[in-house]
Amino acid sequence: MEGKPQRKQNKYKKKVCRFTADPELAKQINYKNIELLERFITNRGKIIPRRITGTSARYQRVLAREIRKARSIGLLPYKVN
């Protein structure tokens, strides 16, 4: 065991995209599905970044587009006071 230092274990669990893991859930991403979209915005109305949610880049773009659609027709707030 001499010569090589021990590797540190990562104490954080690797985030897995829930839409890649479950294709049926990916089909439910829609601007009318407010319950799903609200999981990806903060209580102040901001979109949560993918480094926090673990969403893949592809589905983060889809989510952001659908959140913007829902905001434009008034289903989601732009910001909360």
UniProtKB/Swiss-Prot annotation:
GO terms for cellular component: cytosolic small ribosomal subunit. InterPro entries: Ribosomal_bS18, Ribosomal_bS18_CS, Ribosomal_bS18_sf. GO terms for molecular function: small ribosomal subunit rRNA binding; structural constituent of ribosome. Belongs to the bacterial ribosomal protein bS18 family. This is Small ribosomal subunit protein bS18. Keywords: Ribonucleoprotein, Ribosomal protein, RNA-binding, rRNA-binding. Binds as a heterodimer with protein bS6 to the central domain of the 16S rRNA, where it helps stabilize the platform of the 30S subunit. NCBIfam families: S18. HAMAP family: Ribosomal_bS18. The keyword Ubl conjugation does not apply. Part of the 30S ribosomal subunit. Forms a tight heterodimer with protein bS6.
